[in-house]
Amino acid sequence: MAGTADFSAGGFRFIPAVFQYSGGVAAAPGYAIARVRFREPLPLREGFGRVERHIKEAGRPLTSFCACELRSPAPFTEQGFRAFNEVYVVTLQKWGLFDGKVNPVARSNVCPEGDPPAEPSFHAFSFTVASADAAPSFVISGSAEAREGGASYRERTIRHGETSPDALREKGSYVLGEMERRLGAFDLSWADTTATQVYTVHDLHPFLADEIVRRGAARSGLTWHYARPPVRELEYEMDCRGVTSEHVV
């Protein structure tokens, strides 16, 4: 598993990325990942409280919190996104997950175009549970069409400012490739997924069959959220997972 690091306190491995999230997580041997979705989005502070209670009631340490799916009112500016992330990681630091530099927790954060929450909120979260014989389980973080790196989002974005069918195909192809790269870091592929999610307000049908389906990303179907990525002028995002259980609370 080249390019991954162990987070033994939580029972998972992760792909190191940026301070606000990792590139993805996979359960360590002897563990599995369980996903919990809230029926309605919960504001960040309330959501963290519910997550804490749920994990403790399951008999797991808070360090088992390995992924979350957030919803925000509207795309952030770059400065606004950083300010939000600096608030978000405070709880992770209190829980023993974030050491001030390395963050092992996977994440997606998108902005529903219809009926958005009034403030950043929890949609779902995942945590590890003990499991002797579970199939590989994992959560790959959301990725939009911006390359990782130190430059601004504008400089890193594929076909910045373009939303033509050709530009969206190129954006989608890049994001699919990034999903595949992250899956590969755990020696996994689309065949191991139990769910794939797309977040865009644009028509993906022109490249649905020959990109998403052909590459195997829709083997368990495709969940399309009519939502935007979390930073302004990004147009297309995906994430995927392979988990052993999913609950709605």
Could you tell me what each predicted segment is?
Residues 1-249:
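Short, polar/acidic, helix-capping and beta-turn segments at strand->helix junctions
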